[in-house]
C-alpha cells in the first residue's frame, strides 16, 4: 500500500440511524473527537496529537476496545467536507494495518438528524473477511446507538 492512500478494503461496512436532535447538536458531538470516550464505550481514550487552525483534531491516538478490535490506533481526520461529513484514515497502529471511515450528517427537520457511519478495517492477523465485516458492523451499530442515546438523554 502506498503512503497516503486509503486502505485497500473492498468495501466499507455502514449503518444509519435517525437521532431526535438538531443537526447542530449532532455535529458538536461528532466534531469534538477528543470527547468520544464520554459516549462511546469502545473508545477508551483519545490523545490529541495535532489540530488545525480552528482547533479541530487532525491527528489523534485512540485506545479502542471493540470486541476483536483492541488496539492503539493513530488516525488522521479530514475536515474538507465538514459540516456534512467527517472522515478519518489510518496513520499507525499496533495490530490494525488499515482503518478508514466517515460520519455523514443529514438534517431531516429542525429536531431530527440522520447519521451514516461507514467503517473499514484491516487487521495484521489472518481473520476471515466475514468475521471482520461482522466486527465492523457491530462496532458501527454500537457507536450509532450510543451516539443516539448520548444526544437524546
Language-model regions, residue ranges each:
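Hydrophobic-ligand binding "helix-grip"
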Residues: 37-38, 45, 50-52, 65-112, ...
Amino acid at each position: 500500500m502506498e503512503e497516503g492512500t486509503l486502505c485497500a478494503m473492498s468495501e466499507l461496512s455502514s449503518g444509519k440511524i435517525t437521532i431526535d436532535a438538531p443537526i447542530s447538536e449532532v455535529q458538536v458531538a461528532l466534531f469534538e473527537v477528543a470527547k468520544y470516550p464520554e459516549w462511546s464505550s469502545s473508545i477508551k481514550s483519545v490523545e490529541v496529537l495535532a489540530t488545525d487552525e480552528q482547533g479541530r483534531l487532525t491527528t489523534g491516538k485512540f485506545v479502542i476496545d471493540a470486541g476483536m478490535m483492541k488496539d492503539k490506533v493513530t488516525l488522521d481526520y479530514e475536515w474538507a467536507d465538514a459540516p456534512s461529513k467527517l472522515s478519518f484514515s489510518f496513520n499507525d497502529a499496533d495490530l490494525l494495518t488499515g482503518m478508514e471511515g466517515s460520519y455523514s450528517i443529514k438534517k431531516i427537520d429542525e429536531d431530527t438528524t440522520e447519521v451514516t457511519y461507514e467503517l473499514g478495517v484491516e487487521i495484521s492477523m489472518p481473520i476471515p473477511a466475514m468475521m471482520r465485516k461482522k466486527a465492523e458492523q457491530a462496532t458501527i451499530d454500537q457507536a450509532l446507538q450510543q451516539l443516539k442515546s448520548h444526544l437524546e438523554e
